[in-house]
């Protein structure tokens, strides 16, 4: 297995109120809209050079269905309404995540992708980034709007959440995205989640074409995959 060097840091300053993971009440009260976010935007630097776009194929892995969402503007929407038949990079996060190689890393890589996509006319027209919260209890549309404002997207980068767990769970199951609340011995929720970092690449037919975990989540690789799918679509326009 090839090693990767972490050259990106993602630091979420929670402040004294959330410094102790043992204080459930304080963790629950932590509000990202009032906290100081500091992201050193970067990515993993893999010890290999990705192959040239179009020199390989990305066979479909799975297909996802449409799901109800709430946009950062508070309006009801759906996954497919956001993607609109375009290539999509979809990531699941929660705004109070403090694991550097978790949600902050995902957001940092999507931030780099956003800038690169905006600088390429074809990518800007045919690619959408979608960040969805798996913490509907705290990550309201207003909170997702704060996150969007922080990143100030240059391309079409959408931020969304769900109304409740009833809408969230089928969405997570469809993507095979494991998420579980971390609880104290007495069963009380710590305010944190155990989750596996996954970022999904969807084609225009909502088929999963790649899944990036910590060891593969590199903006250069994702961009190469996007260009590979665009080249393939030109060869097979139907």
Regions found by a protein language model. Give the residues of each.
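N-terminal targeting signals for export/organelle localization
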Residues: 1-66, 70, 238
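Solvent-exposed, acidic/flexible segments
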Residues: 60, 82, 96-106, 137-141, ...
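Extracytoplasmic
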Residues: 62-64, 82-89, 124-127, 139, ...
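Structural microenvironment flanking redox-active thiols in thiol-disulfide oxidoreductases
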Residues: 105-171
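Short active-site neighborhood of thiol/selenol oxidoreductases, capturing the structured segment around
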Residues: 78-109, 129
């Amino acid at each position: 297995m090839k090693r990767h060097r972490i050259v990106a840091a993602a630091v979420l300053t929670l402040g004294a109120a959330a410094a102790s993971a043992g204080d459930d009440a304080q963790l629950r009260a932590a509000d990202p809209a009032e906290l100081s976010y500091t992201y050193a935007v970067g990515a993993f630097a893999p010890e290999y050079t990705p192959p040239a776009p179009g020199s390989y194929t990305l066979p479909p892995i799975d297909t996802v269905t449409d799901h109800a969402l709430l946009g950062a503007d508070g309006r009801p929407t759906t996954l497919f309404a956001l993607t609109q038949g375009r290539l999509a990079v979809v990531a699941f996060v929660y705004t109070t995540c403090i694991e550097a190689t978790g949600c902050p890393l995902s957001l940092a890589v999507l931030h780099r992708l956003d800038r690169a996509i905006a600088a390429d006319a074809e990518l800007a027209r045919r690619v959408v980034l979608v960040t969805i919260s798996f913490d509907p209890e705290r990550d309201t549309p207003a909170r997702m709007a704060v996150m969007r404002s922080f990143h100030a997207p240059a391309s079409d980068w959408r931020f969304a959440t769900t109304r409740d767990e009833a809408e969230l769970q089928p969405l997570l199951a469809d993507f095979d995205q494991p998420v579980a609340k971390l609880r104290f011995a007495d069963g009380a929720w710590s305010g944190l989640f155990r989750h596996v970092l996954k970022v999904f690449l969807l084609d225009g037919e909502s088929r999963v074409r790649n899944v990036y975990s910590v060891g593969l989540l590199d903006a250069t690789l994702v961009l190469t995959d996007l260009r590979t799918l665009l080249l393939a679509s030109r060869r097979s326009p139907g």
